[in-house]
């Protein structure tokens, strides 16, 4: 069984037992989180597509950890002017483990 969920403005295909890094959620480690914006639920050849969401479908996950991704380096420069600006950014994430899909 698998599902497609929406969180943090992104779509993820998930299945029970999978680990996933999503945009940061303000939930403590060890707690469970429920996603109710489920776009699609599939089980073998039986696929249920929502319009826009599947009614009554939820995905339950457990928060494993919070952290930050690797640094993304950004360089801006102006040609022929001896001007260069180096910047970096580390995005926060929440790692979750999918524990169940109810459809």
From Swiss-Prot:
Superkingdom to which the source organism belongs: Bacteria
UniProt-recorded Gene Ontology molecular function terms: rRNA binding; structural constituent of ribosome
Alphabetical GO biological process terms: translation
InterPro entries recorded: bL21-like (IPR028909), bL21-like_sf (IPR036164), Ribosomal_bL21 (IPR001787), Ribosomal_bL21_CS (IPR018258)
Keywords linked to the UniProt accession: Ribonucleoprotein, Ribosomal protein, RNA-binding, rRNA-binding
GO cellular component, one term: ribonucleoprotein complex
Function: This protein binds to 23S rRNA in the presence of protein L20.
Family: Belongs to the bacterial ribosomal protein bL21 family.
Subunit structure: Part of the 50S ribosomal subunit. Contacts protein L20.
Protein name: Large ribosomal subunit protein bL21
Source organism per UniProt: Pseudomonas savastanoi pv. phaseolicola (strain 1448A / Race 6)
